Regions:
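N-terminal beta1-alpha1 cap of cysteine-dependent amidohydrolase-like domains
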Residues: 2-194, 207, 214, 218-251, ...
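Gly/Ala-rich beta-loop-alpha elbow adjacent to hydrolase catalytic centers
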Residues: 197, 201, 206, 210
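Active-site-proximal beta-strand elements of phosphoester/diester hydrolases
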Residues: 298-301
Length: 333
């Protein structure tokens, strides 16, 4: 090594490192563990018990606890509510997306139902005999797996559905949607699930049980109020609840309820076991109905989902939604 190369500095000894004694390994006291187990079993112990009887009692108690916990969790599970589809039928010569059959829901109805923290599912039409996409899924599967059904508004109910012919071509309605929603409605009723119909849905409930409709209120009831105008949901009128109606109980104290009005058809002859829940004022057009042989199957002729945006003078229909969801929750019992 060259003499002019720098040398490393000498190491300076540090303070001595004190060695810590190793922590003793703790061995679990088997007697203590056995004691805890015995004390746990003691609450199930009875005089003269055999080991088999004691084991059966312990297993039975724990099974009941698990079942109660499952029931609590199931009842607290978020409700799953189905909404029927509106259907767009393409016109001849349409191109692109408008050349396809479309199924959709109006945003406000979904948001109104979800305002009570439930999950909303649009229910499509089904075709078990389809050539392209055959399926074994039926509308009954939806009725079994969902907790309730909302029937949307939309196109007219076809007069053929209540054994009439349309008096004008533009009142022909949507027969395909009628068939789909009637099956859907009956499937939910058959399994005891609640149904809430809005506008067209109200009319469909009446028709489903043998009722009929006015094809056009202005034509068929000349003295009636105008129930539809170009201002759409801004058009409104008063309603009244007949004595003993469930809506009258829900809205006890509301002196002059106001609702929107967006319909030119209306309930005419009531179906079997259908009772009137509300009339329009002063013309007496049916505005709400209820099917008496089910816990909750109700139709509202107005659109409750538009009321919040329409102003404070419109009837707050949250009690109706809450009653519908109560019935949905109770079907789990």
């Amino acid at each position: 090594m060259a003499q002019d190369e720098p040398q490393p500095p000498p190491e300076v000894p540090g303070p001595p490192i004190e060695k810590r004694p190793e922590a003793p390994v703790r061995v679990p006291d088997r007697r203590a563990t056995q004691g805890q187990t015995m004390r746990g079993h003691a609450k199930y112990q009875r005089d003269g018990d055999t080991p088999l009887a004691l084991a059966g009692r312990v297993i039975g108690s724990r099974w009941r606890a698990l079942r109660e916990r499952f029931n609590r969790d199931f009842m607290n599970r978020t409700l799953h509510i189905g909404v029927s589809a509106r259907i767009f039928h393409p016109e001849p010569g349409a191109r692109g997306l408008l050349s396809k059959n479309l199924q959709y829901l109006e945003e406000s109805i979904a948001q109104w139902v979800m305002s009570r923290d439930v999950l909303v599912f649009r229910i499509p039409t089904v075709n078990t005999n389809g050539l392209l996409h055959p399926s074994n899924i039926t509308l009954r599967h939806y009725a079994r797996h969902l907790d309730g059904l909302v029937l949307q508004g939309g196109a007219d109910v076809a007069p053929q559905t209540y054994s009439e012919v349309p008096t004008r071509p533009e009142w022909s309605g949507d027969r395909a949607r009628d068939v789909y929603e009637l099956e859907l409605l009956h499937e939910f009723v058959d399994v005891g699930k609640p149904v809430l119909g809005v506008c067209r849905g109200c009319q469909l409930i009446n028709v489903a049980f043998g009722g009929t409709l006015y094809q056009d209120v202005v034509t068929n009831v000349p003295d009636a109020l105008a129930h539809v105008q170009d201002i759409y949901d801004a058009h409104r009128h008063a309603i009244r609840f007949p004595a003993g109606s469930s809506l009258g109980k829900m809205f006890h104290g509301v002196e002059r309820p106001i609702v929107n009005s967006i319909h030119h058809q209306a309930v005419k002859e009531l179906g079997r076991d259908i009772r009137v829940e509300a009339y329009s004022e002063p013309d007496g057009i049916v505005e709400a109905i209820r099917y008496e042989r089910a816990d909750f199957v109700m139709g509202l002729q107005w659109h409750p989902e538009f009321h919040r945006a329409g102003g404070v003078e419109l009837l707050d229909c949250t009690p109706v939604l809450d009653e519908f969801l109560r019935a949905a929750r109770e079907t789990r019992l």
